[in-house]
A protein has these predicted regions:
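Conserved "landmark" site that anchors the functional core of diverse proteins
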Residues: 11, 102-107, 112
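Short, Lys/Arg-enriched N-terminal segments with co-localized hydrophobic residues
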Residues: 1-15
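Extended boundary segments
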Residues: 16-57
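C-terminal structural segments of small proteins and small subunits
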Residues: 85-106
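Compact, glycine-rich, soluble single-domain proteins
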Residues: 47-80
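Short alpha-helix capping/helix-loop boundary micro-motifs
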Residues: 28-31, 63-65, 83-87
Length: 113
């Protein structure tokens, strides 16, 4: 952290060699990995070009895939781009890969309201 600045005020230097996950809107509960994450890697969460937090990868997360940005209980909507893109089929821990093994689609299903 830069002296005199809170974590929320830090501006991201794109040349910095830190692992980053991009949160696209304040409403999202998942972010996009900007490089491969190995289990145990610490990553910065970036929103609007600023560091808003850090987390640790609980699983491997490949470049371009989604990471949970907080604990997501089963049945909770998965939100990316401020839109629901699915629903958690099981509990998802913060820092875990979010993909077809732990989410289910909600579009075009006649059994959901």
């Amino acid at each position: 952290m830069v002296a005199g600045r809170s974590l929320q005020q830090q501006v991201v230097n794109p040349m910095e060699k830190r692992v980053k996950v991009l949160k696209l809107t304040p409403h999202d509960n998942v972010g996009t990995a900007l490089q491969d994450l190995k289990k145990g890697d610490t990553f910065q969460i970036i929103l609007d070009g600023k560091v808003i937090g850090e987390d640790t990868a609980k699983t491997e997360i490949p470049f371009g895939f989604k990471a949970a940005l907080g604990n997501i209980p089963a049945g909770t909507n998965i939100v990316k781009y401020a839109h629901v893109i699915g629903r958690a089929s099981i509990d998802i821990q913060s820092g875990e890969l979010v993909h077809v093994h732990n989410i289910e689609g909600t579009r075009g299903r006649g059994d959901l309201n």
